């Protein structure tokens, strides 16, 4: 979940996302199918005053962002966190993450920014002097861009004891086979590298130590393995699991919709619609294959078999509370708090008069009251990677491919002027056929950075390029001027931020060697 200096990952078509590898995604759509990332456009309408990166589909995907957007709309607590691995100068690719974090803070979220120095040391092998130098540069740029340090929190992994304690507790829930399956770790992987992963899981959940709340992690898609692992760990630490149930038999997540459909259709088969029997529902599903449209055959067969095995037991909706790892006192308190009809079993409780939402809220409240974390599974948003100015990937190891936030304005402008474009071979061909802004690193500069909040400018550049009215020379000149202006202002703001950083409780001189 950290941004480092490479911005490089394996493509989705390779069915591998490596947080420490290279970052070129050949088909972002494949991420939806392969990894369950959802399209951001599906939640865009629910986001108050969306950021330009959202409006322009640069933020293209999400996991569970609806709960964060709902918190914004309802003026409820939420948080945003991002980490930065200080392995080189911050560049314009990192600015995108800075902007996302700052925007969430401006929308009312509790904002957290961290320096992933333990990860940089263990996974990248940087010495502590290098880490200290780069950490300061990242923090100065973040503050210069508008991060409110009085309202947010900045920290280093290596000096945050609460974080380290949380990482230790989360490590109890993780095992080496998961590291192998998720990250490809093997027998030659350093233990410190594994430990840094658990620390990142703690980073992601750290904003909820004071109280559970929706939390969004803005990242590139290469960091999705971290997000998925953190969501799994958040669930494992919970005292209770709340599910929909219909009988004493347990149905899997993919089976419940079909059971719900059978219950809703009870008037078609039940002798007593107030008390449909499981065996009646099984017979109806077996005789009505259309009821299982969209459900794979194995799932439908499993549902029918389970219903048959339940026999004459009534098919009746309920909410089921499973005891995962609650203390005896917490489980007893939960039973006492459940209103209305309930049935208590060894390891779970069925409640017949609670909605699923009310049940989840109740389970969370009881857990927190009895010393549990109550973690809400973290959400995430995913942005596209910027193309390098030379046309390939953007990497700090290739100075010509990126613009550092520390570049002087003239150098930044020169890099833009030398950038690859999506233009045609000749001006005449460009006027006749139009350019290719979708394959142009210079247009990306406008869309990602230079147009700022001015959608009209980004749209104008795109349209003029595509229809042949804009030639690459003039477009580069305009972009170079805007880049120089941005860098000049940014570096002035960085200097002003030095006094702010000096007053913060964050140590930039590591005692480590």
Swiss-Prot record:
Lineage: Archaea, Methanobacteriati, Methanobacteriota, Stenosarchaea group, Halobacteria
Entries under Pfam families matching the protein: tRNA-synt_1b
Domain of life: Archaea
Any GO BP: tryptophanyl-tRNA aminoacylation
Keywords associated with the record: Aminoacyl-tRNA synthetase, ATP-binding, Cytoplasm, Ligase, Nucleotide-binding, Protein biosynthesis
Organism of provenance: Halobacterium salinarum (strain ATCC 700922 / JCM 11081 / NRC-1)
Record's catalysed reaction(s): tRNA(Trp) + L-tryptophan + ATP = L-tryptophyl-tRNA(Trp) + AMP + diphosphate + H(+)
EC number, UniProt record: 6.1.1.2
GO MF entries: ATP binding; tryptophan-tRNA ligase activity
Name of protein: Tryptophan--tRNA ligase 1
GO cellular component: cytoplasm
Family that this chain belongs to: Belongs to the class-I aminoacyl-tRNA synthetase family.
Keyword S-adenosyl-L-methionine: no
Gene3D superfamilies to which the protein is assigned, alphabetical: HUPs (3.40.50.620), Tyrosyl-Transfer RNA Synthetase (1.10.240.10)
Entry's localization field: Cytoplasm
